[in-house]
């Protein structure tokens, strides 16, 4: 059995997190300004690699906690991204997850340490690799899910007004519509 595994190629299994927040009527995305290669100085999603002793879901929770200090956050798997040349460093297949967090509850020092910044979803800079595709798919999933389940509450503080709730759901709908309008 060992020969079967050793005769097949190996590659990395990555995790990329699309972290959404809501502030002042706008959906924002937590992005990393990379201070490491490949693509140093470029904008990316927060990511990491699955370790031998963890599931992909546990790896996503770990990556999110390492960046934000938050645990028990709403997360959903977006999908697998495995184009052969998606990462110029090595052969990497990535599983993307999106997370919805209250923008006022994360560890600001930890985020600064990772050189991460909140960016309005409708004003995103160019992202590396296939990260734009991940964001697009996550936005579509979030909009779809928000239309049938109350997932938006994860983006709001414990106490909120009805106008904040309305503003949130309008922002979820408008941000996705805005994206689609610019693609055509």
Question: Where do the PLM segments sit?
Answer:
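N-terminal strand-loop-strand
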Residues: 2-43
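Active-site segment of metal-dependent pyrophosphate-handling enzymes
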Residues: 11-15, 57-61, 65-108, 123, ...
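Hydrophobic side chains in beta-strands
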Residues: 19, 34, 99-101, 118
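Conserved Nudix-box catalytic region and its N-terminal flanking loop in Nudix hydrolases
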Residues: 26-70, 147-171
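Short, His- and charge-rich active-site/binding loops that engage polyanionic ligands
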Residues: 29, 34-36, 40, 47, ...
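NUDIX/MutT-family hydrolases
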Residues: 98-99, 107-146, 155-168, 180
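Acidic, proline/serine/threonine- and glycine-rich low-complexity intrinsically disordered segments
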Residues: 173-175
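Conserved small/polar residues in nucleotide/adenosyl-binding loops
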Residues: 177-184
